[in-house]
A protein has these predicted regions:
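P-loop NTPase catalytic core
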Residues: 1-180
């Protein structure tokens, strides 16, 4: 399958052709009925498991458009790619602040979750204060959390970048995250 978005657009055309009324942004009700059936084919069963990576193309970076919103409600997590990060030559251009895993609590050790939470907090705090920092309006010492984010944001961003030919093991990544 090319993308969930194109699947939804094709299903919308089928729905409209058989007389279904358009609902959210022109998508017919059958689109939203088919999405869970399509996506829930993957996962764990008594004879094995299937892992899938679905892509959703969003119009104008609107992550609340109907298909993206429906898919987020169905899947156990989502990875958001950011044009802004790509423009900064930050690859992979994964937007950690907007990406979510509902399974992380079930599959990660306590120290791993704590380190990941700290990194997410540094990113979120820096992002909130970035405009003030960039124009020189933020005065160091006025907010401990922002000071910490300024101190660690380059380390976090460096950790999140990976060269095309760079290799690292899962264990190395976790240790580097914990030691940051």
């Amino acid at each position: 399958m090319d993308s969930v978005t194109r699947f939804a657009m094709a299903q919308r055309e089928v729905g409209l052709a058989i007389g279904e009324p358009p609902a959210q942004k022109g998508y017919t009700p059958s689109v939203f009925a088919e999405l869970p059936r399509l996506m829930e084919r993957t996962g764990l069963s008594d004879v094995g498991s299937i892992t899938a990576f679905y892509t959703v193309l969003v119009d104008g970076d609107d992550f609340n458009e109907p298909i993206a919103d429906a898919v987020r409600g169905i899947l156990d997590g989502h990875i958001v790619l950011s044009r802004e990060l790509a423009h900064k030559n930050h690859y992979p251009a994964i937007d950690i602040s907007n990406s979510v895993s509902r399974l992380m609590n079930d599959i990660c050790e306590i120290e791993h979750k704590a380190a990941a939470s700290q990194a997410r907090d540094i990113i979120a705090t820096f992002k909130e204060a970035e405009d003030l920092i960039n124009i020189g309006a933020y005065e160091r010492g006025s907010n401990i959390k922002i000071d910490k984010s300024i101190e660690y944001i380059d380390k976090v961003n460096s950790y999140l970048k990976q060269g095309v030919n760079e290799k690292s093991s899962f264990e190395d990544n976790i240790n580097n995250l914990k030691n940051m």
